[in-house]
């Protein structure tokens, strides 16, 4: 396409970079050019007739009309208006103007292209389109940042392809001023309809433009699906925002330059991204006048509308795809249809959902409606934030008519990937402060620099007597005294060069002290950063807010979000492009992002690293710890409320992190402080003083009101008692094992009982239709729990008093029940648990804390974040169920009892009397008191027990004996009540309950810290407790479960179980089959399972009776995987499969699986568990698999369970094996790795970018470092230099993930071959004697690798096929390559010495064709196009042999055609050259290179000739019933030996003869290895047969290889092949007794061969059904089975063969 357009000159005035030619429009802020730039087919056909003289002249016109009146209008009226003034007067027009440019660009591109091509040929235009695509698409990828960067590709005019005449025509026809706009005639409802001429000055908003971000990719995808016409198909990249704008309205002021351009037939339209809201509004109050900025300027067209008095329309608030929320408009269904917008399905879905909601609201109770309305209000508030600019991150280089650049805006509550370009005039009117801050940041002199002198030498400390003016921000906030002291302590530590731990108790303002300290460094010592703050996601917004409040002069960037967001930050927020100095002072990020981008973030020298919630670093073996400790930093600060949790080792880990030189050895630290509690901690306290500061509230906040805790004990309801007894009875067997039982079993029972103590619904939820009305439902809800009966009374009393309540529970399902209860009672509440994320969480907290808030309750999960959640506006805390870990409950209380609290805080802990809950509380009290008292002397707070060993499991502080005793607690009393006569708890007045409650007030006293730690425990007198008292009493008087649970209840349970078993025995056959199948697929048999459970070696009868366990995969008991949840195990296994040698790559796996808190020991334990479990599962299932033979259908393969996670053993091991070559090839040392280059020659990758050997090497390094499939991570690593090469923004450009996967598979195969080749050379070098030994040992080795072979044969085709391929490649090509190398060394041609050391002629090595040659080859090979396409696409459902035959036939057809083509040449050099060229062309259709294909073809020809000769021979020999076969004859010569020598004809012996005959093909043949146990008769197969299979085996492997990209198990398992082949060969080699039969077959074959020109050995390629038929109809010695197309052997050989073969192998030959 040619020609500069007036569109471009217009853009120059509006802040767009001028571009033309191929890149027309692609750099616009909206990105429209690129999309349209790629459409050519449609436009060339549309405009073909009439654009020959006019198309290029009016190329810039977006929607050209053919009426001349419009042109006259343009020439008559070109007035100019000051853009800024005009906009101020008519802001509502903005939405119209924003699209003017967008809609011009696509048309311009379409009209210019036909002018340049003029071919009208669809093929030509599409090929020119391809080249356009590549350049314009490339520009489009960068349009996010190039519009504003001076160095961006948007600024230079890319006019290389433009013809001068076109340029001049453009210049002469248009003067390119901003006012060149003209009204169009078609009105869109989104635009105001009566302002046509006044808008001339305003082209501007093209840039407000679409968001240029990841949403464009979505546009493209949606668009791809649409493809409504040929033009659309070409225009894959169009984004909808432009699409709709193609339609021109009378309100769009565009100038038509020159003559008319024909109107396109197919227009492109806007797309609905989301329907945000719905209303009934005034008729006509829709379109552009309803945007937020138009409403602010002109007023709301819907204002004052009353539904009763005037008719209205149902209107929908539309978020347009590619536009920010500020441009949302109200539309009716009618106006949307008029505009022909896309995405109407979204509107239909919204309407359906809205109708459902309305129906529900009609029948819902008032409190449900209230709850719904509150939720809606929160959502609306959130949506409003999307219209507020948080910060501006870029501006365009050129200014618009209004004299303002466009701005790139980040919106509040949305990630960076949702940034969008907006019009300068609009943003300056609404968000001028953001613009000022942006320019202030850009011009700031206070950016980090490396030569700051205080980094090299710390200054002398000068104490701050009063708060400096720079701290406190604009609002003049004041630090409290202790916070100023804390700031001084932090400053003192920094000056002394001590990194430190700020361990103030929760609620004392650690965040503010940290920010003030950074502010101090910034102002006092001119240290401007960079400061890195690593914080949990939950507190990130509060950190951001506090930085803005307390240190607004510092530029803090939040480094968060998906890869697009982070790339955006790196592009715009990271550094100044000119000076390369960092822009930010503080970088805020989370642990997870830090680990994802550790290579990038770890490359900076940080002046300061601060870690919030630093107890996450307590494990010095975790990946997070190892990653962060390696970061380069000048000073470190850890911020934690709980520096000491479980052991002294954890405290040492924190100290080692901040001061690795001082606290270098744990052993020394333990020796010094770990022993002797009397004096050890005093010395420790002294040593810690310079590094650790901890204050508690009572020490510093005298004003903090009292905290009173009461333990309220209540009885269970009757239903709870029933359920409680039922749980114990049901688990009688597990309980009666006592200390022999499993911890996990006891814990599970205990969790069930704890659920029962909370509420019956947690055990058995009610049916939906169980209750008739709300009142009944509420009563049942309350009566189902003793705790809720009490809570109900308590809340009613608190509501009367005006208290506000926080209710904590560990169980989210319990929170659901409480929420339901609160709705029934119509108590307004908020809720926060782990599932409520980010912005919604913030909204809920703010809503509860707001002045005059109506909220009465706040439901919280006890563990909802560590979290700095401040709910000081509440004065009552109800702990519904106590946590195992008292510190969690303590944190819960601190949500309310913290700075800012004015009232006394009452804490009510609910405990069920006579249940496990009560006993847990008592035991925890006894067990933990002493240790907490010790901790208090150190003035540090810990969670549980202080001891020097490693931490006990935080989830279960009790051992089996204690758990057993806890479970018995209260059970006896409970069973004394007869079943069905359980008493309801007696009614009691709430005041009476509170009076009786165990109460504890936290008055300050000498033991206040201990009391604080044990605030949940009422301990009468600490001093009376000697250590002896703490010892837990043994279960002296405890009864057995037989005595506790009545016998009749036990009998009834057993009877129920028996009935269940009988039911299962008679269950439907279909269900039985299903169970069997599960058992076959994954689980071990009943026998091994019963052994495991019962401990006996034989089948236990009771186990055999239990069909219900039949299909359960084996489970590794939970004790083995302590510390990992099921979700974590799943993540671990997913990552485990991405790495070769996974047990050596645990750090990478932990990073990928986000398990960085786990220690290497735990990870190794889990890794070994996975690996050993897989191997064992495969071993156990091998017999079953063999029996199944080549079963059709998908075989899932053996599975086993780790905890609750099912693992497919076959798949895991397959992935492990597949990636071993990569693991072995890439150096583990990072420095060596940087130098790595792939040692093999690689075929060119046909990507849309330059891709060479270096990129292949970097891709492999990336896979090694980040795991197979982690393409995003690989893209982000700057060291790999693939950032701009892989995963381009344009989804139509390669390489995307699919291409990368294919390339990676290919490269790993090359590595595998290379390794195999080297190994073979090493073995060759070892000499012949060793080789003989190897062969002798082979049979032994086979046993050891049985499991591995099983894996390979069964698993995803990749690994096994790869090994086959490696060996084949070796076996096939090694002898020839030796010969070839000898020749090539002699020849004069230049050679290239490869990594394997073999010279390859340079001419041969390069297998690329230039474009011209490629085109010639393409034409010449057109007659065999079908064969080329089918070469790697056999029909589905073919057996492997049929596939193989299919390939051979294709190859013969192609080769014959090439031979025909070469006949026109007489010059031998030409023939040689063109033969090579044509075969290189053929190689593009398959994985094999040209040489290999040619070789295979030659071999096929040879076979064809032999087959013809043999068929002649066969017809002659048939009369004598003998087929001559040199190999057979040779074999017969040896039959004169005695039996022993006959028997010694093992596989190896025969093969050695064969090797002599056909060069040495023995080394590394894994294929033969795997056959060894499946094909006992293969050793006697005749030599030709061997050769035959080997020559073509690669092809079938290749097909399987291709299949792996579709479905791993689509074809039958690979075992099937050897067994078929073995079976066939057996038949071929049996002796011939039935001569007539034999003759019949050979006659048949000879006739068919002449007909089909097939090799005599094609007999091998029988279809599956024939083989099945023959196998079924004949025994091993039946006449039919003994026919052979080749020679025969004597009966002696036959019997010898049978003697050497175990009889059972016949079963494995079944197909």
UniProtKB/Swiss-Prot annotation:
GO terms for molecular function: ATP binding; ATP hydrolysis activity; chromatin binding; DNA binding; helicase activity; histone H3K4me3 reader activity. Residues 270-362, 387-450 form the Chromo domain. ATP binds at residues 504-511. Pfam families: CDH1_2_SANT_HL1, CHD1-like_C, Chromo, Helicase_C, HTH_CHD1_Hrp3, SNF2-rel_dom. The modification Phosphothreonine is found at residues 235, 248. Its EC number is 3.6.4.-. Keywords: ATP-binding, Chromatin regulator, Cytoplasm, DNA-binding, Hydrolase, Nucleotide-binding, Nucleus, Phosphoprotein, Repeat, Transcription, Transcription regulation. GO terms for cellular component: cytoplasm; nuclear chromosome; nucleus. It comes from the Eukaryota. Residues 17-27, 35-63, 105-120, 151-162, 1507-1516 have a biased composition (Low complexity). Residues 491-661 form the Helicase ATP-binding domain. Residues 1-10, 67-85, 1370-1379, 1524-1574, 1691-1702 have a biased composition (Basic and acidic residues). One of its GO terms (biological process) is chromatin remodeling. Abundance is higher in cells representing early stages of the B-lymphoid lineage such as pre-B and B-cells, than in cells representing mature plasmacytes or other cell lineages such as fibroblasts. Residues 1629-1645 are annotated as: 3 X 5 AA repeats of H-S-D-H-R. It catalyses: ATP + H2O = ADP + phosphate + H(+). Sequence repeats lie at residues 1629-1633, 1635-1639, 1641-1645. It is found in: Nucleus; Cytoplasm. Residues 121-133, 214-224 have a biased composition (Acidic residues). The keyword Chaperone does not apply. Residues 790-941 form the Helicase C-terminal domain. Belongs to the SNF2/RAD54 helicase family. ATP-dependent chromatin-remodeling factor which functions as substrate recognition component of the transcription regulatory histone acetylation (HAT) complex SAGA. Regulates polymerase II transcription. Also required for efficient transcription by RNA polymerase I, and more specifically the polymerase I transcription termination step. Regulates negatively DNA replication. Not only involved in transcription-related chromatin-remodeling, but also required to maintain a specific chromatin configuration across the genome. The 2 chromodomains are involved in the binding to the histone H3 methyllysine at position 4 (H3K4me3). The CHD1 helical C-terminal domain (CHCT) binds DNA and nucleosomes. PANTHER family: CHROMODOMAIN-HELICASE-DNA-BINDING PROTEIN 1 (PTHR45623:SF7), CHROMODOMAIN-HELICASE-DNA-BINDING PROTEIN 3-RELATED-RELATED (PTHR45623). This is Chromodomain-helicase-DNA-binding protein 1. It comes from Mus musculus.
């Amino acid at each position: 396409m040619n020609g500069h357009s007036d569109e471009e000159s217009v853009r120059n005035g509006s802040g767009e970079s001028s571009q033309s030619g191929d890149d027309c429009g692609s750099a616009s802020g909206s990105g429209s050019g690129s999309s349209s730039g790629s459409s050519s087919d449609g436009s060339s056909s549309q405009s073909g007739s009439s654009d020959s003289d006019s198309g290029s002249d009016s190329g810039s016109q977006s929607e050209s009309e053919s009426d001349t009146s419009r042109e006259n209008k343009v020439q008559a009226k070109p007035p100019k208006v000051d853009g800024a003034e005009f906009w101020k007067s008519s802001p509502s027009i903005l939405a119209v103007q924003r699209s003017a440019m967008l809609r011009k660009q696509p048309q311009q591109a379409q009209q210019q292209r036909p002018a340049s091509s003029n071919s009208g040929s669809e093929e030509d235009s599409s090929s020119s389109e391809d080249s356009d695509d590549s350049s314009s698409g490339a520009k489009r990828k960068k349009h996010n940042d190039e519009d504003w960067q001076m160095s961006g590709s948007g600024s230079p005019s890319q006019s290389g392809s433009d013809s001068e005449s076109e340029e001049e025509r453009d210049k002469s026809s248009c003067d390119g001023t901003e006012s060149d706009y003209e009204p169009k005639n078609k009105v869109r409802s989104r635009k105001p309809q009566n302002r046509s001429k006044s808008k001339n000055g305003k082209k501007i908003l093209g840039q407000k433009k679409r968001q240029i971000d990841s949403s464009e990719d979505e546009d493209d995808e949606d668009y791809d699906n649409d493809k409504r016409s040929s033009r659309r198909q070409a225009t894959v990249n169009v984004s909808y925002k432009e699409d709709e704008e193609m339609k021109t309205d009378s309100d769009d002021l565009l100038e038509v330059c020159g003559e008319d351009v024909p109107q396109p037939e197919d227009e492109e339209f806007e797309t609905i991204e989301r329907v945000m809201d719905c209303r009934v509004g005034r008729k006509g109050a829709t379109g552009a006048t309803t945007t937020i900025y138009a409403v602010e300027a002109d007023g709301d067209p819907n204002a004052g509308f009353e539904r009763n008095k005037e008719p209205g329309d149902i209107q929908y608030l539309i978020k347009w795809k590619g536009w920010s929320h500020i441009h949302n408009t109200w539309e009716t269904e009618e106006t949307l249809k008029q505009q022909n917008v896309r995405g109407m399905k979204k509107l239909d879905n919204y309407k359906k959902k809205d109708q459902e909601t309305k129906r529900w609201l009609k029948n819902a109770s008032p409190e449900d409606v209230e709850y719904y309305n509150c939720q809606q209000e929160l959502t609306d508030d959130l949506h409003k934030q999307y219209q507020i600019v948080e910060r501006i991150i870029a501006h365009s280089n050129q200014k618009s008519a209004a004299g303002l650049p466009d701005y790139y805006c980040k919106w509040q509550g949305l990630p960076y990937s949702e940034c969008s370009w907006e019009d300068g005039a609009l943003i300056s009117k609404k968000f001028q402060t953001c613009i000022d801050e942006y320019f202030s940041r850009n011009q700031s002199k206070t950016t980090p620099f490396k030569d700051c002198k205080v980094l090299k030498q710390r200054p002398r400390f000068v104490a701050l007597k009063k708060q400096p003016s720079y701290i406190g921000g604009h609002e003049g906030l004041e630090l409290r005294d202790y916070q100023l002291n804390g700031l001084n302590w932090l400053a003192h530590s920094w000056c002394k060069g001590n990194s430190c731990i700020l361990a103030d108790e929760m609620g004392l303002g650690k965040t503010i002290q940290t920010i003030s300290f950074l502010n101090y460094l910034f102002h006092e010592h001119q240290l401007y950063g960079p400061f890195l703050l690593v914080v949990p996601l939950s507190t990130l917004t509060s950190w951001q807010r506090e930085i803005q409040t307390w240190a607004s002069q510092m530029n803090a960037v939040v480094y968060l979000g998906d890869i697009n967001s982070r790339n955006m930050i790196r592009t715009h927020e990271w550094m100044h492009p000119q000076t390369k100095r960092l822009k930010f002072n503080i970088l805020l990020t989370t642990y997870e992002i830090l680990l994802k981008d550790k290579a990038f973030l770890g490359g900076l020298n940080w002046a300061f690293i601060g870690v919030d919630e630093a107890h996450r670093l307590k494990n010095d073996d975790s990946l997070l710890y190892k990653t962060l400790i390696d970061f380069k930093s000048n000073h470190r600060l850890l911020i934690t409320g709980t520096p000491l949790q479980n052991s002294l080792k954890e405290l040492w880990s924190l100290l080692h992190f901040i001061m690795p030189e001082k606290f270098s050895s744990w052993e020394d630290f333990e020796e010094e402080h770990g022993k002797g509690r009397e004096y050890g901690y005093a010395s420790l306290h002294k040593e810690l003083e310079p590094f650790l500061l901890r204050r508690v509230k009572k020490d510093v906040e005298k004003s903090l009101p009292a905290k009173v805790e009461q333990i309220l004990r209540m009885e269970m309801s009757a239903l709870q008692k029933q359920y409680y007894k039922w749980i114990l009875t049901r688990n009688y067997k597990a309980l009666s094992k006592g200390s022999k039982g499993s911890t996990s079993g006891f814990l599970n029972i205990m969790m069930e009982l704890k659920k029962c103590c909370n509420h019956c619904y947690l055990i058995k939820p009610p049916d939906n239709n169980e209750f008739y009305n709300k009142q009944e439902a509420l009563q049942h809800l309350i009566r189902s729990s003793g705790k809720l009966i009490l809570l109900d009374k308590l809340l009613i009393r608190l509501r009367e008093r005006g208290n506000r309540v926080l209710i904590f529970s560990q169980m989210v399902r319990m929170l659901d029940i409480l929420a339901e209860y609160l709705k029934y009672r119509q108590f307004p509440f908020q809720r926060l648990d782990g599932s409520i994320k980010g912005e919604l969480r913030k909204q809920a907290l703010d809503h509860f804390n707001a002045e005059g808030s109506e909220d009465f309750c706040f439901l919280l999960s006890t563990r909802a974040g560590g979290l700095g959640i401040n709910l000081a506006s509440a004065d009552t805390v109800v702990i519904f169920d106590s946590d195992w870990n008292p510190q969690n409950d303590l944190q819960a209380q601190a949500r309310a009892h913290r700075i800012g609290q004015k009232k006394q805080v009452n804490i009510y802990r609910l405990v069920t009397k006579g249940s496990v809950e009560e006993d847990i509380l008592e035991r925890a009290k006894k067990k933990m008191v002493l240790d907490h008292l010790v901790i208090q002397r150190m003035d540090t707070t810990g969670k549980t027990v202080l001891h020097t060993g490693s931490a006990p499991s935080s989830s279960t502080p009790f051992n089996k004996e204690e758990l057993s005793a806890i479970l018995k607690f209260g059970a006896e009393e409970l069973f004394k009540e007869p079943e069905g006569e359980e008493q309801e708890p007696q009614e009691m007045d709430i005041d009476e309950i509170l009076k009786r409650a165990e109460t504890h007030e936290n008055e300050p006293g000498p033991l206040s810290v201990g009391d604080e730690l044990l605030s949940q425990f009422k301990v009468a007198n600490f001093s009376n407790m000697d250590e002896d008292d703490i010892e837990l009493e043994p279960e002296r008087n405890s009864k057995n479960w037989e005595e506790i649970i009545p016998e009749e209840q036990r009998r009834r349970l057993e009877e129920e179980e028996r009935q269940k078993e009988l039911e299962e025995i008679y269950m439907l056959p279909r269900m039985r089959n299903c169970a069997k199948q599960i058992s076959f697929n994954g689980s071990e048999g009943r026998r091994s399972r019963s052994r495991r459970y019962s401990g006996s070696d034989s089948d236990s009868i009771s186990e055999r009776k239990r069909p219900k366990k039949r299909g359960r995969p084996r489970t590794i008991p939970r004790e083995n995987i302590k510390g990992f949840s099921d979700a974590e195990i799943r993540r671990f296994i997913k990552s485990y499969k991405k790495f070769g040698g996974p047990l050596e790559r645990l750090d990478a796996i932990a990073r990928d699986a986000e398990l960085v808190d786990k220690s290497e020991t735990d990870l190794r334990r889990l890794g070994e568990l996975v690996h050993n479990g897989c191997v064992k599962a495969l071993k156990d299932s091998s017999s079953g698999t063999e029996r199944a033979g080549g079963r059709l259908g998908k075989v899932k393969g053996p599975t086993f369970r780790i905890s609750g996670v099912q693992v497919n053993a076959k798949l895991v091991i397959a992935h492990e094996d597949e990636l071993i070559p990569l693991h072995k090839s890439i150096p583990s040392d990072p420095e060596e790795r940087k130098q790595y280059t792939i040692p093999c020659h690689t075929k060119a990758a046909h990507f849309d970018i330059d891709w060479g050997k270096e990129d292949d090497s970097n891709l492999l390094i990336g896979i090694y470092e980040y795991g197979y499939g982690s393409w995003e991570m690989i893209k982000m690593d700057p060291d790999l230099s693939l950032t701009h090469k892989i995963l381009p923004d344009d989804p139509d450009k390669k390489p995307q993930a699919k291409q990368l996967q294919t390339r990676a598979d290919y490269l790993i195969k090359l590595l595998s071959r290379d390794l195999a080749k080297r190994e073979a050379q090493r073995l060759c070098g070892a000499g012949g004697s060793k080789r003989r030994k190897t062969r002798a040992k082979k049979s032994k080795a086979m046993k050891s690798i049985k499991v591995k072979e099983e894996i390979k044969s069964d698993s995803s085709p990749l690994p096994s096929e790869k090994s086959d391929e490696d060996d084949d490649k070796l076996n096939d090509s090694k002898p020839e390559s030796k010969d070839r190398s000898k020749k090539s060394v002699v020849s004069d041609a230049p050679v290239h010495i490869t990594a394997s050391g073999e010279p390859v002629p340079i001419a041969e090595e390069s297998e690329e064709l230039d474009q011209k040659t490629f085109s010639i080859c393409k034409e010449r090979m057109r007659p065999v196009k079908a064969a080329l396409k089918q070469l790697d696409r056999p029909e589905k459902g073919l057996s492997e042999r049929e596939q193989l035959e299919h390939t051979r036939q294709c190859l013969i057809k192609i080769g014959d055609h090439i031979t025909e083509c070469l006949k026109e040449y007489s010059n031998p050099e030409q023939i040689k050259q063109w033969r090579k060229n044509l075969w290189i062309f053929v190689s593009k259709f398959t994985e094999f290179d040209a040489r290999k294909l040619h070789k295979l073809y030659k071999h096929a020809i040879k076979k064809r000739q032999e087959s013809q000769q043999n068929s002649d021979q066969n017809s002659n020999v048939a009369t004598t019933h003998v087929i001559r076969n040199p190999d057979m004859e040779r074999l017969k010569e040896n039959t004169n030996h005695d039996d022993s020598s006959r028997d010694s004809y093992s596989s190896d012996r025969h093969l050695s003869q064969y090797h002599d005959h056909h060069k040495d093909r023995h080394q590394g043949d894994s294929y033969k290895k795997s056959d060894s146990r499946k094909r006992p008769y293969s050793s006697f197969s005749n030599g030709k047969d061997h050769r035959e299979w080997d020559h073509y085996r690669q092809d079938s492997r290749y097909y399987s290889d291709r299949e792996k990209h579709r479905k791993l198990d689509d074809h039958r398992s690979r075992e099937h092949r050897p067994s078929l082949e073995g079976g066939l060969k057996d038949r071929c080699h049996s002796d011939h007794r039935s001569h007539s039969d034999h003759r019949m077959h050979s006659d048949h074959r000879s006739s068919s061969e002449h007909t089909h020109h097939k090799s005599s050995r094609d007999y091998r390629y029988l279809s599956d059904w024939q083989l099945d038929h023959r196998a079924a109809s004949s025994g091993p010695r039946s006449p039919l089975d003994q026919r052979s197309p080749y020679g025969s052997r004597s009966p002696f050989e036959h019997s010898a063969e049978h003697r050497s073969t175990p009889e059972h192998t016949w079963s494995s030959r079944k197909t």
